[in-house]
Curated annotation (Swiss-Prot):
Recorded family membership: Belongs to the QueC family.
Organism of provenance: Desulfitobacterium hafniense (strain Y51)
Subunit structure: Homodimer.
A Pfam family the protein falls into: QueC
Name listed for the protein in its UniProt record: 7-cyano-7-deazaguanine synthase 2
Cofactor(s) recorded in Swiss-Prot or TrEMBL: Zn(2+)
């Protein structure tokens, strides 16, 4: 069976990505990261998702000395959702470069054909490492900088959600039977999702537009003025 490394955060996008890889017939090898993020609950969610798919191995990599972000530094406040067009303080420097590099090394050792990453350039927070240009550049690195690549057996970097809106991602997850009830998206990392951070707002907006009820609990459901479809109470 063909093998795939799946970058699994425990969030909505990575879980949907996992469902796509599963449906495509890959043997799944999820990889999760503890980089000191304040939303440690996502690691519990990732474990639950991995167990749902009955994977052979779920690796957790600890990365130290990552900082400079509201997601890692207690001194930087996680802001509520905004559409100011700026790269937000929740950007973690070089995060996807680090994650993909670890996944690439792991994948080359165990003979993976693909690495799945749940990035999107549509409904996203403006992070530069979630754009098509980044994905294309990293694929080039794989092609010319690995034994697999120069031997003509390169590892494909797959981002099936890259051009999907959040609503389309949620619809795809529903079609694939992805366990979204196990997921968490909140940057603040409380027992219940806050409902007002960037990630919560984009998630709630996506569920509203998809016409599907979000299976997780929120402290509140934030500012609904940005939703084209009203949320159900």
């Amino acid at each position: 069976m063909k093998k795939a490394v799946v970058l699994l955060s425990g969030g909505l996008d990575s879980t949907t990505c996992m469902s796509v890889a599963h449906k495509a017939g890959y043997e799944l090898y999820p990889l999760s990261f503890d980089y000191g993020q304040r939303h440690q609950r996502e690691l519990e969610a990732a474990k639950a998702v991995a167990q749902y798919y009955k994977v052979k191995e779920h690796r957790l990599i600890k990365i130290e000395h990552v900082g400079g972000s509201a997601l890692t530094d207690a001194s930087i406040q996680v802001p509520d959702y905004t559409e100011d067009g700026q790269i937000p303080v929740t950007y973690v420097p070089a995060r996807n470069i680090l994650f993909l590099s670890y996944a690439l090394g792991y994948g080359e050792v165990m003979g993976a054909e693909a690495i799945f990453i749940g990035i999107s350039s549509v409904d996203y927070s403006g992070y530069p490492d979630c754009r098509p240009e980044f994905l294309q550049a990293f694929q080039k690195v794989v092609d010319v900088g690995t034994k697999a690549g120069v031997s003509g057996q390169t590892i494909a970097i797959k981002a099936p959600l890259l051009y999907l809106s959040k609503a389309e991602t949620i619809q795809l997850a529903a079609e694939n039977g992805a366990p979204l009830h196990h997921t968490t998206s909140c940057y603040r990392g409380g027992e219940k999702a806050c409902g007002t951070c960037d990630s919560c707002t984009l998630r709630l907006k996506g569920f509203a537009e998809a016409g599907i009820k979000d299976p997780i609990d929120y402290v509140n459901q934030g500012d609904r003025s940005c939703f084209s479809t009203p949320l159900e109470d």
